[in-house]
Every structure is written in structure tokens, then in C-alpha cells.
């Protein structure tokens, strides 16, 4: 008996109810911010702020302290500045608007709220039909230490002043005409000094500011008397300025890759030459103070490198990053009575990650970050979330990660402002991410910030070109400049076949299965001790005895020969290689039964990793549908291979199979003898070629034959809406080594709409999926 229902149109009331029942709200963002564009730090509150190209501002303090603000207009944040110690922050957008944000308390929680905004009059952006006016476009902002005045340098060379915190424009604007009156005649080469590139407050006299113009002129301007105290006649295009702590000198950086040190003297109002001029990657020179700068590399040889250089005495390191340097700052002493800055850490914001360098330890090592670790250090190909992690497993994963990185101590994290008021999570949660480079990374997902715990690499199991590339990298580090690779973001993979496609974990036994692009299925177990053994390989052919098929895809990954050393952590048990080596589309693990199931576009297989032997394999497109009573079930282990070579009676006679509509036709079809013949390789449409892709697999102890007897089963769902269920004869724990697992074909279910089956779950009487531990305890 069949029922057909006419599909109803979209009911407005139904859609409204659907919105009420299914609502998705963003609660937290994990990982590194997308497209960062600005950086700021408050040394008093010990808070760091990052602005993005999408108009977001994110504030970070101690682990768990995070706040986010979003501008109304989607414009890139070009600059951000903290009002020191006030819990306020200024932002400049690329639409030339300035915004004041404030951290406010609501319901005992801190929120980032915009309180004021300002736009400099006269700015007209490019609109296609109106000529742009960039004269009042803000190029640089200077926030005075008193936090009561904001200076704005513009592209037209003017400097404007705003009163804080109201963002009121003051009648104190400084234009190039006033400056040009003090410039010597021989230095005036044209009518313009160029845009304002840098504004810096005098460290000892807050009434004076240093103004740097792009053509190279630097002016020390007195705000009270409105006159020029000193002129510094630079001849190179200016990039930035920074004061020396005493205020007796400052450093200017230039477009030719060099920097100059200038002396500030009241007896010499017009300085033509600096104290020293240095091109770091010209001839090496002895430099005593600590000097930090980004860029400066010879364009012809290293113009494509993203570098930041650290110079101190005879030590010279060029930090080589894999993404662009956005900005950086140092964490140093802010006490004016101290003679030196005494920097303790260098914080570098890159386009794809955040890197912190310890400046007080020998060799300037990196400091592990408790948050903002780039999830996408290598492209993410899959993920797996584990909730309510057992304490023993959690401690063992933590221990393995600490042995990987002995210096990984988050207590030394220098950005520690604020206080995390959220209570510690009662349950531990793990997030596992599979990556294109063959790694699986373990993250602490119990709180707001994702903390990296442990990294598993599968590349050492296979013979790849990784070792050759590493040797080339080490050889390159001995050259000049002294490059040192820093950061974990690496968008390139040595071999795309290493990519992890599926992950399955048993949190009670510490067993893990990862499957890759080249048909590799790797069974691992968590070990606390180092081991050294050969790679155990088992090959499973999913297309046994199928003639006429030629695999035209990539080759399998060759396993590494000889003995392989495995560090404490997840270690290899057996490597199962599917043939043909197509990407694995589904994998599942049952540690109690010592079984794994895996599927590709060519079928699925069941493997006993305790006996290192396959239980059965099957291609969904070649299987015989179960259309009779369950008593006619045969052992897959004995007859499944023969079923690959059988075809239905309709194909033997060359006729299309008739649709079964009555019980009589079912009996006749099952009673008919089908002679084993070689199946013809017939061309299939693109849709038909994808119908055999296995989308999901599931182990369950459930009822398959009837409603009174339950037992081990395995279920498989395909892209064409088919579900295959098998009863498993699993021996007891004592007889695992003596008896093998048997698989019996149970049921085939074909969904009428033939939509892909993406997940299968077995529910208990209350409609909940039973925990594997609960099932084990009830036994």
C-alpha cells in the first residue's frame, strides 16, 4: 500500500513557528581574527586591541578575557589607540571617521560600547562621479599621554586637534604655510612637504610634538607658543619616527631600508645631518642598543619576505614570517624615572597570526599564546568535537603536549589585564581539527579561548619530501641576512595526499582513527612512553576481482621503511590502506569490539585491527538488495566476494529490472537462480557515479532481526539514500585472538527521495543516543 501526499506551499505561519523554534545566535568566536588591520596596547590595564578590515574591534587580556565591538559601517579599521588606564579606545576607519569606544559594566559584565564619533570636515572620498578631496584625509593619529588631546595628521600636510573625550574640533589647526616660513630657502623644493607620516609626543615635555613629513622634513613644534623649536632636514622619504627615552634624540626610518639617529639641541635649531645613518642590510656595524624594525630588506633579493629584525650588540636575528606584518609593539617599563625602557616582550600582529617574542631570554624565543592561535595554520579539512572528556584522558593529552613543547608555559603570557569572571567549566571539552598537512591538532574547547594542547603529525609514517624541504630550510638559515622562521601559519602542504579527511575517537580507551586523502586509515593509541617499531601495514581492496577497472587518480602514500620513533602521545597501531587509494569519506571506531569501518567512493570495509585482518568489504552499487526474509541471510565473509561477480536476473537477460509491487513478485525473484557471470563495466552518468559514495558509518548494539534480541551491528549510509545494516558476530574479550569477527548482511533500506544519508544514530526508548559507556556498564 502506498500513500502520496501533495507538497504544500510555504505557509507563513509555519515559517514563523520555524523561526521561533530554530534560532541561531552567535555566542563566541574562536581562533584568529579574520583580516586584522590595526593593533594597540594599554600598559596600565594590560589589554591588547586588534582591529579588522570588517570594522570589528577585539580586546584581549588574561585568558578568557575577551570583548568585541563592531562599527555600524563596514569599513576597515586603520588605527586604534588606548586612552591609557581609562578603559577607552579610539579607532580610525578608512572612511575617515574617528570613533570613541568605552568599556562599560552591565550586569557585572564588561561590554565594549561606542560613545562618540567624529568626521573631519572637507573630506570627499572617491565616488566615480565626484573628484576626491584627500587633503583632509587622516594619515596618522597622536593621542597625548594626558589623554585630553588628539592630534590628527592629514594627507594635505595639516595637523588638527580634537578635545577628548568629546571629540570636539579645536581652533588650533597647524598648516604647512606656518612650517614653510621656518624652512631654509634651499630646502624648499616645491610647494608641498607631503603628507604627515608620523606624530610623536616629546617624552619629557608634553607641550612639544614631533611632526614628520613624507618628503623627509621633521619638525619639533611647540603647542603653546605655536612656533618651530627645531628643524631636521632629512633627504630620504620618511616612514616613521620614534623618540629615545630621554628626549635628547629620536630615530627616523626611511624608504631606502635605513634609519637615522638625530640629536635634539636647543643651540642648533636647524639640523642638516643626523648623528648616525644605518642601512642594516648593507655592511654590518656594531650596535649596542636594542633596535627593532619591520621591513628594510633589499627589494631585489628579499622583497617578497615578511620580516622583523632584532639588533642588539653582536646579536642579530631576522624573524621571517609567512604572512604580512601589520604592526608590533613592545611591553616595557613605562616609569618615567627609569633610565631605560627595559623591554621584556615583543608582540607582532601578522595578517594570519599573533607572535610574541621573549626579549629577556637568550636567543629571543617565542612565547606560546594561550589564545588567538591560528586554527587555520594549515587548511582545516575536518573536525571532531568531544564533550565530557574523562579526566584521565585529559591529563594524558596535556602531558603529551607538554613533552612536545617543554617551554610551553602560559603563566609567562605578558598580556594579562582584566579578570575572567566566568566559572571554570565542570566538563572538559576537546576539539580535534584535521589539516591539509596531515596533522591533527587538539584544542581545549572548555572556555572562550581555544588553547592548543597537542599536535599529532601523520607525515612521519609515510615517505614524503618533508625531510628534503627541512634540510633546504636549514641551509638557508645560515645565509645572510640571518633569517629565522617564526610562527606556525603555513598555508602550503608538502603533499596534498596527507590531508586528514575524517576523525573518530574513543574517549574511554584512548584510541584514535584518522583517515586521509590517499585512502590511508591510521589506527592510533595513546601511550605515555616513547616507542620504536616498524610500520604495520594492511591493505584492503574494496574492488576485489573487479576486472576492467583502472584507477586514474593519485598513488598511495608509501609507508616509511625501517623502524620509526614515536614520541609520547598517540602512536601507530596499524596503517590500513584502501585500494583504490581514493579519499576516505567516512570512518568510525568501536574500541570494545576492536573494529573500524571506513568508506570511500568505491565502497566500504570492516577491519579487525586486533587480528590485523579485514572482516568484509562491499561496493553499494554492486550489492544484492535484501528482498526476502531475514532467515535467508548469508555470511558476508563466505559469500560477499562472490556477490561482486553476480548480477540481477534482469541484467543477465538484458532487460530493465521491473519495479516490485507485490509479495508474489518478490518470492519469484528470490527463487530465481542467478548464475555467476562476470559483470559488464557499463558507463554511468555523473550522478550515478556518486551514488555509491559512503557518507556515514555507525556501530551500535541494537535490535536488527527483531524487537527482542539485540547485538552488535554496523550501519552504512550512502549518497543515493541507501542504508545498509549488518549484524556482527563479535567474540568475547577472552577469545579475540582465537575467533574472528563475522559480518552478516541484515537489511538494506532505500529512502524514496534518495537524498544523501549524512548521519546515522541509534536512540534509546527516550529518544536519546545512549552513551557507549552507559551501554558497557549495563552489560
Regions found by a protein language model. Give the residues of each.
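Per-blade loop-tip surfaces of WD-repeat and WD-like beta-propellers in eukaryotic adaptors/scaffolds
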Residues: 15-25, 59-68, 100-123, 156-189, ...
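Canonical WD40 repeat/beta-propeller blade segments in eukaryotic WD-repeat proteins
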Residues: 30-40, 75-82, 119-143, 181-202, ...
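Sequence/structural signature of beta-propeller modules
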Residues: 1-15, 630-650, 655-665
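Structural hallmark of WD40 beta-propellers
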Residues: 45-49, 67, 86-90, 99, ...
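Short coil/turn segments within WD40 beta-propeller repeats
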Residues: 54-55, 95-98, 156-157, 215-216, ...
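Extended amphipathic alpha-helical scaffold segments
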Residues: 312-316, 320, 330-337, 341, ...
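N-terminal alpha-helical scaffolding segments that mark the starts
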Residues: 1-58, 67-70
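Non-catalytic interaction/regulatory modules that flank or connect domains
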Residues: 273-376, 591, 602-603, 710-713, ...
Amino acid at each position: 500500500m502506498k500513500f502520496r501526499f501533495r507538497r504544500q506551499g510555504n505557509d507563513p505561519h509555519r515559517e514563523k513557528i520555524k523561526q521561533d523554534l530554530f534560532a541561531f545566535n552567535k555566542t563566541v568566536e574562536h581562533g584568529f581574527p579574520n583580516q586584522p588591520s590595526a593593533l594597540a596596547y594599554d600598559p596600565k590595564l594590560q589589554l591588547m586591541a586588534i582591529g579588522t578590515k570588517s570594522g570589528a574591534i577585539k580586546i584581549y587580556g588574561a585568558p578568557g578575557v575577551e570583548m568585541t565591538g563592531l562599527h555600524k559601517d563596514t569599513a576597515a579599521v586603520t588605527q586604534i589607540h588606548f586612552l591609557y588606564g581609562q578603559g577607552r579606545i579610539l579607532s580610525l576607519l578608512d572612511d575617515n571617521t574617528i570613533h570613541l569606544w568605552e568599556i562599560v559594566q552591565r550586569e557585572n559584565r564588561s561590554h565594549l560600547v561606542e560613545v562618540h564619533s567624529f568626521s573631519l570636515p572637507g573630506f570627499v572620498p572617491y565616488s566615480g562621479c565626484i573628484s576626491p578631496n584627500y587633503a583632509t584625509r587622516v594619515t596618522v593619529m597622536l593621542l597625548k599621554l594626558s589623554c585630553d588631546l588628539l592630534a590628527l595628521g592629514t594627507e594635505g600636510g595639516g595637523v588638527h586637534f580634537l578635545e577628548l573625550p568629546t571629540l570636539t574640533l579645536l581652533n588650533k589647526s597647524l598648516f604647512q604655510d606656518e612650517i614653510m616660513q621656518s624652512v631654509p630657502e634651499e630646502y624648499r623644493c616645491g610647494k608641498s612637504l607631503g603628507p604627515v607620516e608620523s606624530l610623536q609626543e616629546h617624552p619629557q615635555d608634553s607641550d612639544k610634538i614631533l611632526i614628520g613629513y613624507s618628503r623627509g622634513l621633521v619638525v619639533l613644534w611647540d603647542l603653546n607658543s605655536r612656533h618651530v623649536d627645531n628643524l631636521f632636514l632629512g633627504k630620504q622619504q620618511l616612514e616613521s619616527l620614534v623618540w629615545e627615552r630621554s628626549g635628547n634624540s629620536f630615530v627616523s626610518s626611511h624608504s631606502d631600508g635605513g634609519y637615522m639617529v638625530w640629536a635634539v639641541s636647543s643651540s642648533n635649531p636647524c639640523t642638516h645631518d643626523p648623528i648616525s645613518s644605518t642601512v642594516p642590510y648593507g655592511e654590518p656595524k656594531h650596535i649596542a642598543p636594542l633596535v627593532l624594525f619591520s621591513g628594510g630588506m633589499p627589494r631585489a633579493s628579499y622583497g617578497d619576505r615578511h620580516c622583523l629584525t632584532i639588533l642588539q650588540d653582536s646579536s642579530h636575528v631576522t624573524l621571517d614570517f609567512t604572512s604580512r606584518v601589520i604592526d608590533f609593539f613592545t611591553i616595557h617599563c613605562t616609569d618615567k624615572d627609569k633610565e631605560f625602557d627595559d623591554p621584556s616582550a615583543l608582540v607582532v600582529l601578522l595578517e594570519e597570526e599573533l607572535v610574541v617574542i621573549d626579549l629577556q631570554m637568550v636567543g629571543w624565543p617565542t612565547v606560546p599564546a594561550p589564545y588567538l592561535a591560528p586554527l587555520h595554520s594549515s587548511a582545516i579539512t575536518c573536525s571532531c568535537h568531544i564533550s565530557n572528556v574523562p579526566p584521565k584522558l585529559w591529563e594524558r593529552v596535556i602531558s603529551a603536549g607538554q613533552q612536545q613543547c617543554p617551554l610551553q608555559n602560559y603563566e609567562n603570557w605578558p598580556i594579562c589585564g582584566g579578570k575572567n569572571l566566568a566559572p571554570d567549566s565542570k566538563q572538559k571539552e576537546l576539539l580535534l581539527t584535521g589539516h591539509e598537512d596531515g596533522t591533527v591538532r587538539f584544542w581545549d574547547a572548555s572556555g572562550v579561548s581555544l588553547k592548543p594542547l597537542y599536535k599529532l603529525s601523520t607525515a612521519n609514517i609515510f615517505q614524503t619530501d618533508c625531510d628534503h624541504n627541512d634540510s633546504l630550510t636549514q641551509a638557508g638559515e645560515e645565509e645572510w641576512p640571518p633569517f629565522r622562521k617564526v610562527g606556525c601559519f603555513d598555508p602550503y602542504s608538502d603533499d596534498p595526499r596527507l590531508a586528514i579527511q575524517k576523525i573518530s575517537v574513543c574517549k574511554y580507551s584512548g584510541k584514535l582513527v584518522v583517515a586521509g586523502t590517499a585512502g590511508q586509515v591510521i589506527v592510533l593509541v595513546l601511550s605515555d612512553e616513547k616507542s620504536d617499531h616498524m610500520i604495520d601495514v594492511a591493505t584492503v581492496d574494496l574492488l576485489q576481482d573487479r576486472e576492467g577497472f583502472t584507477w586514474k587518480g593519485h598513488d598511495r602514500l608509501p609507508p616509511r621503511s625501517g623502524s620509526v620513533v614515536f614520541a609520547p602521545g598517540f602512536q601507530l597501531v596499524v596503517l590500513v590502506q584502501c585500494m583504490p587509494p581514493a579519499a576516505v569519506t567516512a570512518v568510525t571506531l568501536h574500541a570494545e569490539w576492536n573494529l573500524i569501518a571506513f568508506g570511500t567512493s568505491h565502497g566500504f570495509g570492516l577491519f579487525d585491527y586486533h587480528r590485523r585482518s579485514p572482516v568484509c568489504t562491499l561496493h553499494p552499487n554492486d550489492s544484492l538488495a535484501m528482498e526476502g526474509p531475514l532467515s535467508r541471510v548469508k555470511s558476508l565473509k563466505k559469500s560477499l566476494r562472490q556477490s561482486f561477480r553476480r548480477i540481477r536476473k534482469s541484467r543477465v537477460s538484458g532487460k530493465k529490472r521491473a519495479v516490485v509491487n507485490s509479495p508474489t513478485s518478490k518470492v519469484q525473484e528470490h527463487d530465481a537462480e542467478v548464475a555467476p557471470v562476470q559483470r559488464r563495466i557499463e558507463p554511468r552518468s555523473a550522478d550515478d557515479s556518486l551514488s555509491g559514495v559512503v557518507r556515514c558509518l555507525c556501530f551500535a548494539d541494537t535490535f536488527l532481526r527483531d524487537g527482542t534480541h539485540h547485538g552488535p551491528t554496523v550501519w552504512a549510509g550512502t549518497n543515493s539514500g541507501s542504508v545498509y545494516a549488518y549484524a556482527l558476530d563479535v567474540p568475547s574479550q577472552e577469545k579475540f585472538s582465537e575467533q574472528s569477527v563475522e559480518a552478516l548482511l541484515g537489511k538494506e533500506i532505500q529512502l524514496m527521495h534518495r537524498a544523501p544519508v549524512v548521519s546515522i544514530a541509534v536512540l534509546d526508548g527516550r529518544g536519546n543516543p545512549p552513551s557507549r559507556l552507559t551501554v558497557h556498564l549495563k552489560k
